Amino acid sequence: MPEGDQGAPPGRRVTSPHRGLRRATTERAILECVAAESGPLTRAELARRTAISPPAVSEAVRRLEAGRVLVAVGPRSGVPGAVATLYDLAPGVGVVAAVEIHRTAVRAAVGDLLGRMLETTDHDPPRDGHDVLARLHEALAEVRARWEARGRPLRAVAVSIANPVDPATGRVVELHESAFPAGVLGADDVRGVDPAMVVLDNDVNFAALAERDHGAATGAPSFAYLHVGERDSVGLGLVVDGVLVRGARGLAGEIGYLPLGGGSERFRFGEAMAAQGLGAGEDAPDEAGLATAGRMLGEAAVAVCAIVDPGMLVLGGPVGLRPGLLRHVAATVVELAPREVPVVAGALGGTAPLRGALAEARRRAWEGLVSARG
């Protein structure tokens, strides 16, 4: 009896456990290849790009087409030789959504699994901290109804919130002067989506991921994203060797709580920043206020450099990108950092948290799509 068939019922074929893994690996490679392209591909093109044998690619494409994951969209035109069929992601695979929640705004975005943003919408902000869940459900209900009516179900959701999120519990953490109360939202509170397909994280973390993937930090394995947001809230997203650092309780990067001064003059860094009047809705500060704020941000950045040695510093957020602030931050870093560290402006502006969240929802959807076929 062949090895592996011992104990099998007569007449029943035993499949190697490695076969399913090979199939899943091939399908993942094909789907990742489709995701990386702006247009559909033929089986031959998929085989060349993935370096997988044409027969294995053809078999995988047949499985994906039968499972309504890929769809034939027509022949390849304008090339010599036999007519080849193009394949693209099937619309029925669905869409992903991201929702960004702040005290003053709720924004939603919908994208497909190929990385294209399909729409953005604005929604009523929460009346208070306990209204967050209701606003989230309203935004997602609108998104779900609109896209399911088009035959495109909601596959994954990412929620960006202006609070830390405990990675162990998946729930919002409350700190002094943070936007929302503790536990106001958790990943398991999102309705109508498999909990495994829900991501909840801090807005600065999502912004850092967006700058890593599509912004100023593209290609940088280690960097620090320094974010100055609404009401002069200050946070840091830290990426080391390509991985976002969250900390044991999701508090990594909460530099607004750095203590400054001494004795009776002791105060928090975030409070000192707020005193400079740099708010996004305020008039432009005078040069002295800008220089003071830039100096404080630069000193905080130098402390980060001394501990984690990032390859670059990215300054972002609606307040962090105010004209003139960057040069003061950079000058302080040049003066005080142990080694030279480039300081650059974020490339994505105020869209960074929402774009980062949408990309994370898409990543989760891809994982679910492939694992469901493994």
Regions found by a protein language model. Name each.
Residues 106-110, 209, 234-238:
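Short beta-strand scaffold segments in enzyme catalytic cores
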Residues 75, 79-96, 198-226:
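Conserved phosphate-binding catalytic cores of ATP/NTP-utilizing and phosphoryl-transfer enzymes
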Residues 122-222, 269, 324-335:
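Glycine-rich phosphate-binding loop and adjoining helix at the ATP-binding site
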